């Protein structure tokens, strides 16, 4: 017999994810040994946490304030940044979002329509950052 178990592990911090991954691996190995099974573990699409660097956050805040843009710190972490964590391991950067108000469908919904009016704001903010 052959079987497969697919799962996604997520955690707020890399250390928590490492512990969780080890626990799942240990449990799977134990179960396989008890039943005389061969276990193969593959990891795909592994990505690190996106942890903004304080200096990067400060630069974004100063640029936004210079343009008169409100800065709102999110109450909860956002995990929608699969690749950006790699960049932040190399540079003192910060991932930030441009809000378009509350009366718009969120990204990844079929009725999402990018608000073109944000382009000018985005360009001005990036110009301040460079």
Give the label of every model feature segment:
Residues 1-130:
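Metal-dependent amide/peptide-bond hydrolase catalytic core
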